[in-house]
């Protein structure tokens, strides 16, 4: 990066060493950004089970690593959170922790898990979470459009007061493998819009 001046983005950081390296690079003025994922921010390796839904790449790390990621979020070293959404069939994830394919789903769980475990516990503000999941990625990669009057909206509506239990059978993704199955969370998705059209809505409302 120093030699070429290239913009550099690191995906799925999960260790304290990665946080330290990126913090150092940014302090030196290098155009380096990074993201991590909900499972690295809310889980540690003591929570692993002999089940394919706990297998992803990078793997779940130690509590020390998790705490370093939180610190990186708070001091701005980590500017984005991504879902790391990797859907696999039930068969591909049924071979146990060692033999199942890498990857878990994240689209349906990312916001409610982070809102419940980081915002409602006071670690992050809701505004900071939106910045990490939406504003910063949009600005870094020049994708999407701002929400402005007269422009076609792309947005998601959540009921922040709605508590529910994560049930993979309710997912719309091909994949059902999530380490968060059975977790009670707040933040139920009620509506999604893409370029001004309703892509999905909760028909129970």
Give the location of each predicted region:
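Histidine/acidic residue-rich metal-binding segments in metalloenzymes
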Residues: 1-81
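Short glycine/proline- and charge-enriched loop/turn segments
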Residues: 48-55, 92-100, 172-176
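His/Asp/Glu-enriched, well-ordered alpha-helical/loop segment
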Residues: 2-5, 74-81, 86-158
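A short acidic, glycine-rich active-site loop
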Residues: 55-65, 101-105, 178-185
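C-terminal cap of metal-dependent C-N hydrolases
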Residues: 99, 149-204
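Residue-level signal for inorganic ion chemistry
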Residues: 8, 35, 84, 114, ...
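Glycine/Thr-rich phosphate-binding loops of Rossmann-like dinucleotide-binding domains
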Residues: 19, 42, 89-91, 156, ...
């Amino acid at each position: 990066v120093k030699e070429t001046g290239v913009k550099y983005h690191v995906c799925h950081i999960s260790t304290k060493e990665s946080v330290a390296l990126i913090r150092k690079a940014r302090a030196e003025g290098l155009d380096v950004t990074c993201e991590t994922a909900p499972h690295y921010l809310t889980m540690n390796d003591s929570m692993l089970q002999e089940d394919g839904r706990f297998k992803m790449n990078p793997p779940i790390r130690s509590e020390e690593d998790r705490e370093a990621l939180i610190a990186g979020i708070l001091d701005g070293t980590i500017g984005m959170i991504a879902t790391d959404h990797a859907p696999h069939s039930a068969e591909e994830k049924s071979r146990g922790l060692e033999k199942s394919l890498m990857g878990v789903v994240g689209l349906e769980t990312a916001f409610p898990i982070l809102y419940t475990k980081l915002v409602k516990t006071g670690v992050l503000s809701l505004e900071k979470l939106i910045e990490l999941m939406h504003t910063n990625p949009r600005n870094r990669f020049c994708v999407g459009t701002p929400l402005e009057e007269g422009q076609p909206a792309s947005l998601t509506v959540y009921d922040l007061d709605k508590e529910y239990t994560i049930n993979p059978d309710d997912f719309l993704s091909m994949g059902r493998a999530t380490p968060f199955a059975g977790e009670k969370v707040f933040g139920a998705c009620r509506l999604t819009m893409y370029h001004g059209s309703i892509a999905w809505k909760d028909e129970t409302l």
